[in-house]
Amino acid sequence: MKKFFAAIVALMLAMPSMAQFASGGFELDKSNLYYGARFGITFGGLSGDTEVQDANLIMDYSGRKTGITLAGVIGLRLSQTAPVFLESGLYYTQRGGKDGKYTADLNCLEIPLLIKYGIQAADHIAVLPFIGPYFAYGVAGEREYIDETSGEKQKEGVYKKFLNRNDMGFKLGCGLEYNLLYAEIGYQFGIANIADNDNNTTHANALFVNLGVNF
């Protein structure tokens, strides 16, 4: 993962000169606005104090849980001399964590503020490394576990009892656009403590892969 972060940062620091170049829904050589849609997969987990003590049963949610992402985005060029863009939008994303037969499902609404830099890779292909903060709110969440006494599957809410709804952190990654088609891979790590008590520190994080279109 450290090598992945280093590669993204190095790519963002590389500032090759940009000639006339257009790719799909937005042009890198002039100021304009673009819109997009995203659909993808997340591999979420919880870090820090991820154990929940309940009736002498310890559940650790640090393992990866697969979820989906749906989003609409909007982007705006920030500079007249360089292909630097600000992209935001509204994301619905499923995160959480698991450990064997125990899972924690977190459904969140998320607003990122991403800085993207456009690099011409080939004709009609743009490489777009990005980094920026995100702000998230948990709209629904539950934990699922097997009751040790009855052996039956149980569910209960996690917000207000174990976790806070508000979250924030940073995203970084890299996108690739070909004509209207867009793909990206990245990682997001929470910096806000979402544990619902002062004795624990819990952060949400996720690896994500998204596909979509830019108009």
Protein language model features and the residues they cover:
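Short loop/turn motifs that connect adjacent beta-strands in outer-membrane beta-barrel proteins
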Residues: 21-32, 78-84, 120-126
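Residues that define the transmembrane beta-barrel architecture of outer-membrane proteins
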Residues: 31-33, 64-68, 105-111, 125, ...
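Flexible, solvent-exposed loop segments that connect beta-strands
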Residues: 45-62, 94-107, 139-164, 193-203, ...
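Predominantly the C-terminal beta-signal and adjacent terminal strand-loop region
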Residues: 21, 26, 48, 85, ...
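Short glycine/proline- and aromatic-enriched beta-strand/turn motifs that initiate or cap beta-hairpins
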Residues: 20-66
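Residue-level signature of outer-membrane beta-barrel architecture
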Residues: 41, 74-78, 117-119, 137, ...
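Cleavable N-terminal export/targeting peptides
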Residues: 1-30
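Transmembrane beta-strands of outer-membrane beta-barrel proteins
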Residues: 33-39, 68, 84-88, 111, ...
